[in-house]
Amino acid sequence: PIDFDLDRTQKTLESVKKNGIKFQVGFNRRFDTNFQSLESRILKGEIGDLHILRITSRDPAPPPISYIEVSGGIFLDMMIHDFDMARYLVKNEVVQVYAAGGVMIDKAIGEAGDIDTAIVTLKFANGVLGTIDNSRQAVYGYDQRIEVFGSNGMIRAENVETDTCILSNAKGSHQPPLPHFFLDRYKSSYLTEMVKFLHCIENDTIPEVVGNDGLKAIQIALAAKESYLMNRPIEIKHTM
């Protein structure tokens, strides 16, 4: 995130605006071709009115405890990308958050003040419902999937495997493994993100992911953290 604190984030964005700085928030997943296709087909109305959004985001292995201690926690460090993706796809603001989670992978993560497994339910202003699940450890690889369900159908963005070859033999069919690192999965999105930002600078245009997108994601993440600690839904008031 831009910062772990909303007030400091707001002041940062005010300074950026005051000084005329080109500013793009690093939500690289918006530049992933699969997720862009998902957004495009939603906007074309291929599945009608949106009803339910489901996002799965699971890392292959937890980061070092030294990182966990300064990360801001799973909602601000990891799930914040999914909060932004939810806004990107639904094109509406989250008004209610309910979070549940626990320490199921490594007790050292809990001792560092964080959790390693979480599920969040979102309610949007337009009535769309969303769920996001995060895990710090999926033993089978980097698991990144999205499903959007609507009045006229459903669209899924499945995992991107290391190649498209499937081995079939006497022991069955065997798919290639999933990427084991986020840079492997999202390499092209990082490149596209940088190219698009350079174009904004060269052509003096507005970046695709602006400061307010970062602010809104932080707001949702902080609400999720509060919900987890309080064990109740948290309402989000959009006054920023």
List PLM regions with ranges:
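A general structural signal for well-ordered alpha-helical segments in protein cores
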Residues: 9, 35, 82-83, 191-195, ...
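NAD(P)-dinucleotide binding in Rossmann-like oxidoreductases
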Residues: 108-114, 125-192, 210
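Generic alpha-helical secondary structure signal
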Residues: 52-55, 189-196
